């Protein structure tokens, strides 16, 4: 038997060339230390920033700090099952979540896993959670109304589709209630409105009690609004990385509708807790602290999230994503770090006040401090026609009311202003879970601005409103339909509406 040296060396070369290939297939690293939801990992040389990595037992993490000798990984889950020396694998994918209509009616966590016990999610597509916002060219200015069903908001601080309107106030002032009522107000459109007007709702609960989230979902379910809503929950007991990720995950789910020529609305409840979670992660990752110990890029955290809410132009499908971020203030301090940041990013704010809430003015909107910077161009013309003067009248009323506490003998015009203001304030009150259609709001505010309430006692205003609405719904449905179809108060409609209100006012007296 002769030995062929060339053949042997060729085989050896081939084997040497393939040696050690298996070990490189999934790049791995080793846990150096773990605690407080953060793991320091040695190895993972080629890991990308924001890449998903996997720990033993299927626990996921995200590489955030890429340092010269180790990688700082935040852990999406319990860190008690991870120990020093564990092997960490790269997944090669940036953190993504399932998106699409299959998520409607479901409650999921920040990674898109179902937590409502209704079986697996049927999703055809996955999206990265952190993508760049649309540029300037694909956008269009906000011009379609996004009705909340609340008179105080739709008349005075209107929100348009694609706008970012901040809801800000102390704890227990009804911030979540505004989002909930807005979701419920979309029910009639989903039942029998055109597809182009349907608004899909996404609710992100960050750092809230589980009981609160369960209550929110229960109300949506009972009122038939869960079928067009998605709830993302990162509750108070979830790790900080989940609370940090939840808004981005919700945004990706909302963007699916925006990019497919549909309209979506997302409520982030609330971003103060996301900032706190991000601060905790940053400090544990040893990033340098800034003002109020928040990291230097906490402004960028919120701006890159909220910039993704947009109205796209017709070439890009004309879809929209409207954002209602919530910020909780401490003792009405709007000048703290996070509130000022988010106020400067958004297109206006609805400012809720504890004092008003306890006076029984609910929704407790402070009309003087609340603004909508782009909403007026989206307001329905009919609403503009009737509500134009309200804001001024209410501002004058507040000024006079403060002044009238001192003087007893007021002239007739001041007295008239005070009377009108008190009745308008009463008119803007609204119980929870009872959103009104735009045409009904127009009719009610028309009655208020045209002096029909001036002769009625303040405590009878609510009764007058309820009576007027039921009379319009039953006997004058044609007037409401005309306002809805025309979207403006023509002379003809105005005359009909005036006649209807006149008739009711006579019978009410």
From Swiss-Prot:
It is found in: Cell inner membrane. The record marks 370 as: Required for activity. The keyword Protein biosynthesis does not apply. Keywords: ATP synthesis, ATP-binding, Cell inner membrane, Cell membrane, CF(1), Hydrogen ion transport, Ion transport, Membrane, Nucleotide-binding, Translocase, Transport. ATP binds at residues 169-176. The keyword GTP-binding does not apply. It catalyses: ATP + H2O + 4 H(+)(in) = ADP + phosphate + 5 H(+)(out). F-type ATPases have 2 components, CF(1) - the catalytic core - and CF(0) - the membrane proton channel. CF(1) has five subunits: alpha(3), beta(3), gamma(1), delta(1), epsilon(1). CF(0) has three main subunits: a(1), b(2) and c(9-12). The alpha and beta chains form an alternating ring which encloses part of the gamma chain. CF(1) is attached to CF(0) by a central stalk formed by the gamma and epsilon chains, while a peripheral stalk is formed by the delta and b chains. This is ATP synthase subunit alpha. It comes from Brucella anthropi (strain ATCC 49188 / DSM 6882 / CCUG 24695 / JCM 21032 / LMG 3331 / NBRC 15819 / NCTC 12168 / Alc 37).
């Amino acid at each position: 038997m002769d030995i062929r040296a060339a053949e042997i060396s060729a085989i050896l070369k081939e084997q040497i060339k393939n040696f050690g290939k298996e070990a490189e297939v999934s790049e791995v690293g080793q846990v150096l230390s773990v605690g407080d939801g953060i793991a320091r990992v040695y190895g993972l040389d080629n890991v990308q920033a924001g890449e998903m990595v996997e720990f033993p037992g299927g626990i996921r993490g995200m590489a955030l700090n890429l340092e010269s000798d180790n990688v700082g990984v935040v852990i999406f889950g319990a860190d008690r099952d991870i120990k020093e020396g564990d092997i960490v694998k790269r997944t090669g994918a940036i953190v993504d979540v399932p998106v699409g209509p299959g998520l409607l009616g479901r409650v999921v966590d920040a990674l898109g896993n179902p937590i409502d016990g209704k079986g697996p999610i049927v999703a055809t597509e996955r999206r990265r959670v952190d993508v760049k916002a649309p540029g300037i060219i694909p956008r269009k200015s906000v011009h379609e109304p996004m009705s909340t069903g609340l008179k105080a908001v739709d008349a005075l601080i209107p929100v348009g589709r694609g706008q970012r309107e901040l809801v800000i106030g102390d704890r227990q002032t009804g911030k979540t209630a505004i989002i909930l009522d807005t979701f419920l107000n979309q029910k009639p459109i989903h039942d029998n409105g055109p597809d182009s007007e349907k608004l899909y709702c996404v609710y992100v609960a960050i750092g809230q009690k589980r009981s609160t989230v369960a209550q929110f979902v229960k109300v949506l379910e009972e009122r038939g609004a869960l079928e067009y809503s998605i709830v993302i929950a990162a509750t108070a007991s979830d790790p900080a990385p989940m609370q940090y990720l939840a808004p981005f995950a919700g945004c990706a789910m909302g963007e699916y509708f925006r990019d497919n020529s549909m309209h979506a609305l997302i409520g982030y409840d609330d971003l103060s807790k996301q900032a706190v979670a991000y601060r905790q992660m940053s400090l544990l990752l040893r990033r340098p602290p800034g003002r109020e110990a928040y990291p230097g890029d906490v402004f960028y955290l919120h701006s890159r999230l909220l910039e993704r809410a947009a109205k796209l132009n017709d070439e890009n499908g004309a879809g929209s994503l409207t954002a209602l971020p919530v910020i909780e203030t401490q003792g009405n301090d709007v000048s703290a770090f996070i509130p000022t940041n988010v106020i400067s990013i958004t297109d206006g704010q609805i400012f809720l006040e504890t004092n008003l809430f306890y006076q029984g003015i609910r929704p407790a909107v402070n009309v003087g401090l609340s603004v909508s910077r782009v909403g007026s161009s989206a307001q329905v013309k009919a609403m503009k026609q009737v509500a134009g003067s309200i804001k001024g009248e209410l501002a004058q009323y507040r000024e006079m009311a403060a002044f009238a506490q001192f003087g007893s003998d007021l002239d007739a015009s001041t007295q008239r202003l005070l009377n009108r203001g008190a009745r308008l304030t009463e008119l803007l009150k609204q119980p929870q879970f009872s959103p009104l259609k735009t045409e009904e709001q127009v009719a009610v505010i028309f009655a208020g601005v045209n002096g029909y309430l001036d002769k009625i006692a303040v405590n009878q205003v609510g009764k007058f409103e309820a009576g007027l609405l039921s009379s319009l719904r039953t006997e004058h449905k044609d007037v409401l339909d005309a306002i809805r179809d025309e979207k403006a108060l023509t002379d003809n409609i105005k005359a009909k509406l005036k006649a209807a209100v006149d008739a009711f006012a006579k019978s009410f007296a």
